[in-house]
Amino acid sequence: AASPAWPWMTAVGIAYVALGVYLLRFLQKKDAVPRDAKKREAMPLFAIIGLIIAAAARLIVANSVSGYQVDVNCFLAWGNTLLSVGPANFYQTTNFCDYPPAYVYIMGLNAALMRVLPLSAAAVHKLIPMACDLVAAVLTYRIARKKNASANQAGILMLLMAFNPAIFLNSAGWCQIDSVLSLLLMLVAYFAVCGNWMAVMPIYMLAVLVKPQALMLGFLGLAAIVMALIRDRKVWKPMLIGVGLALVTAVIVVLPFSVNQGGISWLIDKYAQTLSSYPYATVNTANFYYLFGCNWTSIVMEAPRAIPLLMMALSLVWTGWLIYRAQKSGWQPDVLTGLMTILLIIGCFGRGGCFATQSGWTRTMIFHLGG
């Protein structure tokens, strides 16, 4: 049955898009303020107040909406199990857990916070994803300022991020953790663009240990590494240090869960099991598959493959057009972005273009808004 809130959600979505279109001209405007003066501008008051309102609104919704009960119940059970038996016996004790170790720690923390905070159990499990929403919004502000946007322009972008209905609903209403993974991937992209490879590698490792879907961006990361090495071969040293830090991160996170597992193969089996446990075109509702009645349709059938193939082809055509325009204008960053996009599309298709995860649109939205 349709949710009774769908008319309001539709109206809010349309209003948000209309507002974004209205503000687009202002966001594209180049003012006459010198670059040095722009850098000295502080975050405007309206942006700070807006961010506080976004946080307060999330808390109200989080405590009022129960969330997706299937996942909420899993989070509650897994968090309490971790508190009861510890990481060494966690996976052996729980009947089912398709999450890697990193986020299991957060579930355990949430289980402990439930005993002291005057919030509903679901609301407590929403706190960290909601915090990541807001941190991602602030990171968007920082990126915009580094791209020479004025403080007002960056503040508007930040609030568009903070009040995005899809992102808001996903964490505050639906109790999903996509914002955690999305923020980590934003940081990976941000530090990669800045050339800070000693930060890129461990953060990406942490992202993979939060949700295995981060592996799907490995192709894009590999392309970025290759291009960075082509531009400057000296970066291999910080990259090597970053790889070492990534391994240290993995050991710190995984080792407590491995004590009684008899080796590291259990983690590989866990990832393989998780990635193969949803062999369906989609298991959510925010896509065309659901509109055509194809929810839970097996990807073994050939018909569902037509849509991702078509979308991949359209994406390649669009990317090719962007590269052509960039070459004519001489803007090399666009060319590099286009090439990396092609590699990402082909890479994701190679890993299984039909694999759709819950609320994957949220990760895409945060990642592209942040970029």
Language-model segments: which ranges?
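Start-transfer (signal-anchor) and selected internal transmembrane alpha helices
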Residues: 2-60, 145, 154-156, 334-338
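Short helix- or helix-capping micro-motifs
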Residues: 54, 157-163, 204, 208
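Transmembrane-helix motifs of polytopic, lipid-linked glycan transferases
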Residues: 123-148, 313-326
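Perimembrane helix-loop-helix junctions
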Residues: 217-248, 259-260
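Specific aromatic-rich, kink-prone transmembrane helix
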Residues: 138-142, 180-197, 369-371
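Membrane-interface alpha helices of multi-pass inner-membrane proteins
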Residues: 169, 185-191, 198-222, 252, ...
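Extracytosolic helix-loop segments that constitute the early lumenal/periplasmic catalytic or substrate-binding loops
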Residues: 71-98, 102, 109-116, 261-270
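Aromatic/glycine/proline-enriched transmembrane-helix motif characteristic
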Residues: 35-38, 146, 274-353
